[in-house]
């Protein structure tokens, strides 16, 4: 499911930048990860390392430009009363709805185990650093998660104020397109930057999703059938399921 969600976001980026219909975009975004994942963790690790500087730069720069060019945006999102324009007063039902989403996302911290499994063995000399790495990369990841949620709220508010319909304002492509319009005066450059950032982000996410999914399917079926046809089979199997979910909308 996570693979399908993230691949769909990347497909919408291809539609935005290259006018590729989502039906074909789903197929492209599903199969493009297969060569990387079948080469194993070493290829995935290299991809993550090589793309990290670009990803961090493209993540932060739009927020800096928004802060410089529209300082009132941060105040505006705090005082935004929602679609019903109830003002900035506390509303228990709205708080409950937001809390439900937040609590559900906390369970995704378990996905960090996919990265922590590659931690080097704990030794007497690395005990302190080992525990620090586990805490920061595991449950401590919720801190970055909160920052990302707050940043997403700001971008969604910016999208709404730029007349993006509410049902489309949840699309990261629309969020970052509005933000990158603060960076680039030319709309075409903003579209290109948005598409590049979203594609890099979703590739970084989905190589992990595909790898973790293949491990899960492999473990499940090896215990059920007592056979192991190879992890590549389960990479393709996992990808086909995600593709089917996307095509079924």
What would you call each of these model-derived segments?
Residues 1-19, 202-219:
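Hydrophobic transmembrane alpha-helices that form the core helical bundles
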Residues 12, 16, 20, 56-83, ...:
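Hydrophobic alpha-helical segments and their helix-loop junctions in multi-pass secondary transporters
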Residues 39-49, 110-146, 162-178, 214-229:
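Hydrophobic, small-residue-rich membrane helices and short re-entrant helix-turn-helix hairpins
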């Amino acid at each position: 499911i996570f693979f399908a969600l993230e691949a769909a976001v990347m497909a919408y980026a291809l539609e935005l930048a290259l006018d590729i219909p989502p039906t074909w975009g789903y197929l492209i975004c599903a199969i493009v990860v297969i060569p990387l994942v079948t080469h194993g963790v070493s290829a995935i690790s290299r991809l993550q390392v090589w793309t990290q500087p670009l990803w961090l730069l493209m993540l932060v720069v739009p927020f800096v430009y928004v802060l410089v060019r529209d300082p009132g945006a941060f105040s505006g999102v705090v005082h935004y009363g929602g679609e019903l324009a109830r003002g900035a007063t506390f509303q228990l039902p709205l708080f409950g709805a937001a809390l439900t989403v937040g609590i559900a996302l906390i369970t995704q911290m378990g996905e960090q185990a996919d990265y922590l499994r590659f931690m080097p063995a704990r030794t007497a000399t690395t005990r302190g650093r080992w525990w620090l790495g586990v805490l920061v990369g595991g449950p401590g990841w919720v801190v970055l998660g909160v920052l990302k949620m707050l940043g997403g709220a700001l971008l969604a508010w910016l999208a709404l104020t730029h007349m993006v319909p509410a049902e489309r304002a949840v699309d990261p492509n629309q969020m970052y397109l509005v933000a990158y319009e603060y960076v680039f005066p030319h709309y075409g450059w903003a579209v290109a930057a948005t598409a590049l950032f979203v594609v890099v982000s979703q590739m970084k996410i989905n190589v992990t999703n595909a790898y973790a999914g293949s491990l899960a399917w492999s473990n499940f079926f090896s215990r059920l059938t007592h056979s192991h046809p190879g992890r590549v089979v389960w990479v393709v199997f996992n990808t086909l399921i995600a593709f089917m979910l996307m095509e079924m909308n």
